[in-house]
A protein has these predicted regions:
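C-terminal substrate-binding subdomain of Rossmann-fold SDR/epimerase-dehydratase oxidoreductases
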Residues: 1-4, 230-358
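Non-catalytic terminal and boundary segments that flank Rossmann-like NAD(P)-dependent oxidoreductase
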Residues: 1-31, 352
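N-terminal Rossmann NAD(P)H-binding glycine-rich loop of SDR-like oxidoreductase domains
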Residues: 30-50
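NAD(P)H-binding glycine-rich loop region in Rossmannoid oxidoreductase-like domains
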Residues: 87-125
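Conserved Rossmann-fold NAD(P)-dependent oxidoreductase catalytic core, especially the SDR/UDP-sugar
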Residues: 131-177
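NAD(P)-dependent short-chain dehydrogenase/reductase
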Residues: 157-166, 189-246, 251-262, 287-292
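Active-site helix of classical SDR
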Residues: 179, 183
Length: 358
């Protein structure tokens, strides 16, 4: 069972052992989590289940999923005491009779191509789902609500600028791909409105691109493709020049950050969530990963916008506010990564190891 062995188990143990998470606040509580089968949601639910077992917290976890059988398959092999499935989606959230103490809203459209091909659905899913969940939070008088937003709400900051939560953004409503970031911004404003008008304790997590164990092998995002290339011993093929620069985030660090925000955050506040030490360009990341895996990098430049890719951006997130909640990235012990410590390659090494466990 993964909870007793392997890289994912290591992550769960490290999260559970994190003392700056006030676990006592979760004792006997009920949590509703949307997006529970997604990468971040899955890691969070798994960590909560592990902590439930190891710390005897007696939590109840309500996981809103579209397909119960798929969800059961995703969590197969785990001890799922306390986990209950609620079948529905963001456009049709079923009635929930149980009391709810905390909500983590992670369900969202995530495929870049869908932002362009299905922009109406992208906006509807974001706004209606968030609105209905905030109404539920108000009704249940929850103790905390975390909305998972995105670094994309900042638009295109200038190169060399450290992006803070107070920064304004510039997004074009005439760009169809803005369906995703503007949808996120709209939901953020709705969260702040509920906090102001109704006193709902809502916090916002603006996450950078996140990866680690638990990534589906056929995930289409660039980090998963790089990992597959290493495992399959084939060259990395970049379809852009790879000029975009950003920081990244490990899945276990994301889950720990969400718990810190939920239990220690300030209502109405947004928090950048990233590992600042991983900041680099996509091209640089490709070269590092290729060197680690003994493969090469080739270029096959294509129309970026047609495929839903972001234009070149420089997203260097400042995580000072999150660190004020005592959060810090987990220090792993990966060895022999180009004979030097490197957080980004450490994340890749653990993700690739984790692919063997699924």
């Amino acid at each position: 069972m993964w909870t007793d062995d392997g890289v994912f188990a290591e992550d769960m143990k490290q999260i559970c052992a994190t003392e700056w998470i006030p676990w006592e606040k979760l004792e006997g509580k009920t949590l509703l989590i949307t997006g529970a089968t997604g990468l971040i949601g899955y890691t969070l639910v798994s960590a909560l289940l592990y902590a439930n077992r190891e710390r005897g917290l007696h939590m109840t976890i309500l996981a809103l999923v579209r397909d119960e059988e798929r969800a059961k398959a995703r969590f197969a092999g785990q001890e799922t005491d306390g986990l209950h499935w609620i079948v529905g989606d963001m456009l049709n959230i079923p009635t929930i009779e149980q009391s709810i103490d905390y909500i983590v809203h992670g369900a969202s459209q995530t495929g870049s191509k869908a932002f362009v091909r299905e922009p109406v659905e992208t906006i509807k899913i974001a706004f209606k789902g968030t609105c209905d969940l905030l109404e539920l939070a108000k009704e249940k008088r929850v103790l905390g609500f975390v909305y998972l937003s995105s670094m994309e709400v900042y638009g295109y900051p200038p190169k060399g600028h450290k992006v803070k939560e107070s920064d304004s953004c510039c997004l074009s409503p005439l760009d169809v791909r803005s369906s995703y970031p503007i949808g996120k911004l709209q939901c953020e404003n709705l969260c702040c409105a509920y906090a102001s008008e109704y006193g709902v304790p809502v916090m916002i997590a603006r996450l950078t691109q996140t990866f680690g164990p638990g990534v589906n092998y056929d995930d289409t995002r660039v980090f998963a493709e790089f990992a597959r290339c290493v495992k399959e011993k084939r060259d990395i093929v970049l379809k852009t020049k790879g000029e975009t620069e950003r920081s990244y985030l490990y899945t276990a660090d994301a889950a720990a950050a969400l718990l810190a925000i939920m239990l220690k955050g300030q209502p109405g506040q947004a928090y950048n969530v990233a590992d600042e030490s991983t900041y680099c360009s996509i091209a640089e990341m490709a070269q590092r990963v290729a060197q680690m895996g003994g493969i090469d990098v080739r270029y096959d430049i294509q129309d970026e916008r047609k495929n839903g890719y972001l234009a070149v951006l420089f997203m260097n997130l400042d995580t000072s506010l999150l660190k004020e909640l005592d959060w810090e990235p987990i220090k792993h012990t990966e060895k022999n990564i180009l004979d030097r410590p490197n957080a980004l390659l450490d994340m890749y090494s653990r993700m690739i190891r984790g692919m063997n466990e699924w």
